[in-house]
């Protein structure tokens, strides 16, 4: 049975743009994929999303329960769907903490300093979808493209199938619309991504 992991980094418990995008994605995806096991990782609740790498925990940060467990799950999963709203010009800190736990040399990528030549990603099995939102129009802060950053990270780890849906400009263009109305404007794009997954 295919396993799809939902990585929830939204700081809003429910009803956010990214949660509503996920609802639409799953509605479409499940129509053609009835025998899929969905695994929910809410990074707001799991230690892997709460614990940041620092001098106090450097010696045990990459423990089995907070690192290898998740790496092993990613290596056997069909794909992951990441909820990534922009927070302070980047994805949420919980997602950064998760990335720090799972992007580990010789586990999710071969480090160029260990293997002669370029680094080699080890998550080649994985398909990735990012469902994202941001208040500013895309491009207002060229240095703050959190979706592009995630694409680069997962590409480095060997992922070749990466798709995203970004609702940008939520604080200006869509400020007078309710969230579901806005998500409905992106329904066609979400359906395309779900059908390609």
Swiss-Prot record:
Pfam families: Flavodoxin_2. One of its GO terms (molecular function) is oxidoreductase activity, acting on NAD(P)H, quinone or similar compound as acceptor. SUPFAM superfamilies: Flavoproteins (SSF52218). Its EC number is 1.6.5.-, 1.7.1.17. FMN binds at residue 10. Keywords: Flavoprotein, FMN, NAD, Oxidoreductase. Its cofactor is FMN. HAMAP family: Azoreductase_type1 (MF_01216). Belongs to the azoreductase type 1 family. Homodimer. Quinone reductase that provides resistance to thiol-specific stress caused by electrophilic quinones. Also exhibits azoreductase activity. Catalyzes the reductive cleavage of the azo bond in aromatic azo compounds to the corresponding amines. This is FMN-dependent NADH:quinone oxidoreductase. It comes from Mycoplasma genitalium (strain ATCC 33530 / DSM 19775 / NCTC 10195 / G37). The lineage of its organism: Bacteria, Bacillati, Mycoplasmatota, Mycoplasmoidales, Mycoplasmoidaceae.
